[in-house]
């Protein structure tokens, strides 16, 4: 049985929880200034999964308001250290993001993932979301 895992909403007051992070939870090392700006931003939330004092997973979401659509949760990023995948950690973090989104008045959510990311696609399918094809563009500003 895996060690106990706690799901935590990260705030400026408890951001030190990010001092110990397992491998591959984030894409890059955390920059303290960027973290402070993120946590200060209204409508943004980072959820982490903590086991034995180490962050083993993270999920980030943003409230996306539009003038012509209901308010949505945009799930920006989700990661779980490889050694703790397939234990339901990602599902628990998504459920915590959904609870927060409902508190913020969100009516729905959206998330994107790579077409070849089978585990992520399985998770998002299990949450009842509809698959929609899209094209993604990215560029420097």
Question: What residue ranges belong to the model's regions?
Answer:
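A short beta-loop-alpha structural element at the N-terminal edge
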Residues: 2-18
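Glycine-rich phosphate/pyrophosphate-binding loop shared by adenosine-nucleotide-utilizing enzymes
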Residues: 5, 54-58, 73
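A conserved beta-turn-beta hairpin within the catalytic core of GNAT-like acetyltransferases
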Residues: 64-75, 85, 132-133
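Conserved acetyl-CoA pyrophosphate-binding loop and the N-cap/start of the following alpha-helix
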Residues: 84, 88-96
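Conserved GNAT acetyl-CoA-binding A-motif
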Residues: 101-112
């Amino acid at each position: 049985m895996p060690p106990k895992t706690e799901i935590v909403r990260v705030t400026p007051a408890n951001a030190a929880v990010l001092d110990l992070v397992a491998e591959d939870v984030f894409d890059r090392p955390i920059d303290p200034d960027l973290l402070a700006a993120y946590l200060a931003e209204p409508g943004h939330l980072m959820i982490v999964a903590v086991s034995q004092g180490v962050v083993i997973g993270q999920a980030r979401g943003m409230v996306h308001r539009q003038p012509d659509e209901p308010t949505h949760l945009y799930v920006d990023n989700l990661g779980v250290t490889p050694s703790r995948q397939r234990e339901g950690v990602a599902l628990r973090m998504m459920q915590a993001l959904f609870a927060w989104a409902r508190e913020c008045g969100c009516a729905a959510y959206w998330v994107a993932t790579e077409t070849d990311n089978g585990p992520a696609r399985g998770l998002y399918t299990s949450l009842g979301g509809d698959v929609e094809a899209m094209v993604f563009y990215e560029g420097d500003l």
